[in-house]
Amino acid sequence: PDVEEAWRKVGEDYMPDGIREFNAYPTVSLGWIMFVGMAMAQLWDTDWQRADADAHIYNTLRDVRGFDHTDDYILDEVLGLDAEAHGAVSRLVNECANRVLALLRHEGLTPGSAEAFRAYIACLHQLYLAGMAVQLRRMGYHMTKIG
């Protein structure tokens, strides 16, 4: 729940970068937020008090290497992945972003419309949650039925 609740502040800070990149690099625009979800899950597990106290945690993650290398920073430094895992996670995120992009385009929304904007935000939110879920699973967390 903590990582999900952070979506509003993460999403608001991500939006200018995501929108700027969408026309030229739509899979980057969609995929990078999945990496951010993964980072947030990792930070929740390791240092949530510091991460939660950072009102602009997305900007903090982005600014270390810049937007274009946010993925590499998260995979290398935040998650500490080796080259093999780095490649596997990058391929997974790329596949997810491409599938979401295909679904988004299939909707036939008018580019620049309010409806298209809302759909884009919904896609980002779901990819953020997917990143969070992937990382929690990688760390060994799993759902257990209670009762």
Identify the meaning behind each predicted range.
Residues 1-147:
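Intrinsic-disorder/low-complexity detector
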